[in-house]
């Protein structure tokens, strides 16, 4: 049987909030089987917990945010969730003492390191996967995203930015998911933004924690970061990273192919919601033998370094 996973022990880090610019402390702790990912705001009294569910993603401007019925929010979850998805973590409690997850270096790599430092352990319950049986597609103008049947988890993603630096890079990528491919080829890709947008955001008290320490920054012509890019195709890879995190609010790893053109947080979440309500388009499955599993996660106790 392929088992569910959680972390072996509590692990903690600090960083800054992308939008507030304030210090944020994050803790990741083990959780029981079938509990999923639950986020808790410890800065509130009493503390407020919000389960990671697609219907609670109620804000998708600049990030993915969970918001409960009382309006309490936890923002910028997507990079952490990409790491959880990439390492196959089914159950965890995430504590944060702020309304947003720390941005770290703008990628998922610090969260991958954190989770690997905590250790990953198997639990005494079958791991469940969402197997796509029928194609689900959502559109917004010329943007679109779809999930369709595939034996494995494949991503086919294309971006289209009218910017000379991005246009010079590869804007289309197809990858078959595995933990090692995610850690090596995707996890280090940073969020990116344009100077003209950053100036507007800061004037509106947003992106106060944003800097070249946690984002790729472009002017009208080039990348401004002194060290340049981590990957030649870092832009499309970061959009894939975001999608991994956004799709993980479905609650389980997906067996299928994710195809997308110019999609972002909003359309990714619309796709997950459309999938979950069309119950004949998918089924929950588990696997008895490692050889039968179409999605390859690393073996607990091993390391997959970028």
Curated annotation (Swiss-Prot):
Enzyme class comes to hydrolase
Which pathway does it serve?
Glycolipid biosynthesis; lipid IV(A) biosynthesis; lipid IV(A) from (3R)-3-hydroxytetradecanoyl-[acyl-carrier-protein] and UDP-N-acetyl-alpha-D-glucosamine: step 2/6
> SUPFAM superfamilies of this UniProt entry?
Ribosomal protein S5 domain 2-like
Q: What is its EC number?
A: 3.5.1.108
Query: Which is a Pfam family this sequence falls into?
Result: LpxC
Question: Does the record carry Lipid biosynthesis as a key word?
Answer: yes
Q: Which residues bind Zn(2+)?
A: 79, 238, 242
* Keywords from the named record: Hydrolase, Lipid A biosynthesis, Lipid biosynthesis, Lipid metabolism, Metal-binding, Zinc
A GO cellular-component term linked to this record: membrane
InterPro entries this protein is in?
Ribosomal_Su5_D2-typ_SF, UDP-acyl_GlcNac_deAcase, UDP-acyl_GlcNac_deAcase_C, UDP-acyl_N-AcGlcN_deAcase_N
Q: Which domain of life is it from?
A: Bacteria
Under the heading PANTHER family, the entry gives:
UDP-3-O-ACYL-N-ACETYLGLUCOSAMINE DEACETYLASE 1, MITOCHONDRIAL-RELATED
Q: Describe its function.
A: Catalyzes the hydrolysis of UDP-3-O-myristoyl-N-acetylglucosamine to form UDP-3-O-myristoylglucosamine and acetate, the committed step in lipid A biosynthesis.
Record family assignment: Belongs to the LpxC family.
Q: What protein name applies here?
A: UDP-3-O-acyl-N-acetylglucosamine deacetylase
Species for this entry? Shewanella denitrificans (strain OS217 / ATCC BAA-1090 / DSM 15013)
């Amino acid at each position: 049987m392929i088992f569910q996973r959680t972390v072996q022990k509590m692990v903690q880090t600090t960083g800054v909030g992308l939008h507030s610019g304030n210090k944020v402390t994050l803790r990741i702790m083990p959780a029981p089987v079938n509990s999923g990912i639950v986020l808790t705001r410890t800065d509130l009294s009493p503390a407020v917990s919000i389960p990671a569910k697609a219907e609670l993603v109620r804000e998708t401007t600049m990030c993915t945010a969970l918001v409960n019925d009382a309006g309490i929010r936890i923002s910028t979850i997507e990079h952490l969730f990409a790491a959880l998805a990439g390492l196959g973590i089914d159950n965890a409690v995430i504590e944060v003492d702020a309304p947003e997850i720390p941005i770290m270096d703008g990628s998922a790599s610090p969260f991958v390191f954190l989770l690997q430092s905590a250790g990953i352990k198997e639990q005494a319950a079958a791991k469940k996967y969402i197997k796509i049986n029928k194609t689900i597609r959502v559109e917004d103008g010329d943007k679109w995203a779809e999930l369709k049947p595939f034996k494995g988890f494949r991503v086919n993603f294309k971006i289209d930015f009218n910017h000379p630096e991005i246009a010079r890079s590869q804007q289309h990528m197809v990858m078959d998911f595995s933990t090692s491919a995610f850690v090596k080829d995707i996890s280090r890709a940073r969020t990116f933004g344009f100077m003209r947008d950053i100036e507007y955001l800061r004037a509106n008290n947003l992106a106060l924690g944003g800097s070249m320490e946690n984002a790729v920054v472009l002017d009208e012509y080039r990348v401004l970061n002194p060290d340049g890019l981590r990957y030649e195709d870092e832009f499309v890879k970061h959009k894939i990273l975001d999608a991994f995190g956004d799709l993980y609010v479905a609650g389980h790893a997906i067996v299928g192919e994710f195809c997308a053109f110019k999609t972002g947080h909003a359309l990714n979440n619309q796709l997950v919601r459309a999938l979950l309500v069309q119950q004949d388009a998918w089924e929950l499955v588990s696997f008895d033998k490692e050889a039968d599993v179409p999605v390859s996660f690393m073996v607990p106790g091993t390391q997959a370094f970028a």
